[in-house]
Amino acid sequence: MQHPFHSYPAPAKLNLLLHVVGKRPDGYHLLETVFRFIDFGDTLELAVRDDGQIVLLTPTDGVPPEQDLTVRAARLLQRESGCRLGASIKLEKRTPMGGGLGGGSSDAATALIALNRLWGLAWPRERLQALGLQLGADVPVFIFGRNALATGVGEVLEPIPLKPAWYLVIHPQVHVSTIEVFRNFSQTVLTEIGRVGIMRILETTQQRRNDLQSVVEKRFPAVNEVLSELRKYGSPLMTGSGSCVFLEFESKDEADKVYRVLSQKYQGFVAEGLDVHPLFDSAE
């Protein structure tokens, strides 16, 4: 038997800055980054199944269902909890793949948060975060549920206050592989800034940087072109490992005004920065 569907948001994120500060012996890079949620993203619909099956009803082109992060998240939670229930999954994708907006990670986190409730597991937030880390370094922040300063590989999280803001996000229509970007990252001087320094940098947009941006600009001319165009209006930044780039504004009107000009040439959207994840109160 399949129960009724319930709808859950999976918001995108922006990295307001991203510093590579070291490298672990296993090859993973250590980061300082600030995550901000925005009111744009995907939507998951989930329905409990009594037969224990995990079924994705809306597979993404080019992604086998067994590799989809929502399916992997559901099966991981099912296995680790010993739950006998299953789920039917519908996924409405809006967040571009390979754009640095955390779409897949957010989908996985939403699946874990929602199924934890639908299956009656009552796992605490910290346990879900640890489980999410097995799926990807960006998954825990979406379960953490607050804008955060992240260190380690991105999994050590502390809440950080951010001022209200609107964002114009442009997708250069290229897919960037995170693995390839880090593989080509060759900066040798790696230094930590720390929370106090980061809070000072966040006061304006001029001093913010993404250490991965130069790697992507060299390999993807389309990203370089969009950044050059956006510099006419402010201090743009790439999010994550790319390819999406963004500008921060104090008001929606300002963001909309610039987007009306750029939308004739580029695909993108305007979104408001959030204080917390829409499902923050769904995890404890």
UniProtKB/Swiss-Prot annotation:
Catalytic positions are 13, 138
Record's protein name: 4-diphosphocytidyl-2-C-methyl-D-erythritol kinase
Q: Which reaction does it catalyse?
A: 4-CDP-2-C-methyl-D-erythritol + ATP = 4-CDP-2-C-methyl-D-erythritol 2-phosphate + ADP + H(+)
Annotated family: Belongs to the GHMP kinase family. IspE subfamily.
Alphabetical UniProt keywords? ATP-binding, Isoprene biosynthesis, Kinase, Nucleotide-binding, Transferase
**Which amino acid positions bind ATP, per UniProt?**
96-106
**The UniProt record lists the keyword NADP:** no
* Pfam families membership: GHMP_kinases_C (PF08544), GHMP_kinases_N (PF00288)
Which GO terms label this protein's molecular function in UniProt? 4-(cytidine 5'-diphospho)-2-C-methyl-D-erythritol kinase activity; ATP binding
**What is its pathway?**
Isoprenoid biosynthesis; isopentenyl diphosphate biosynthesis via DXP pathway; isopentenyl diphosphate from 1-deoxy-D-xylulose 5-phosphate: step 3/6
Which purpose does this protein serve, as stated in its record? Catalyzes the phosphorylation of the position 2 hydroxy group of 4-diphosphocytidyl-2C-methyl-D-erythritol.
From the UniProt record, give one GO term of the biological process aspect: terpenoid biosynthetic process
Answer yes or no on keyword Nucleotide-binding: yes
Q: Quote the EC number.
A: 2.7.1.148
Matching PANTHER family: 4-DIPHOSPHOCYTIDYL-2-C-METHYL-D-ERYTHRITOL KINASE, CHLOROPLASTIC
Q: Which domain of life is it from?
A: Bacteria
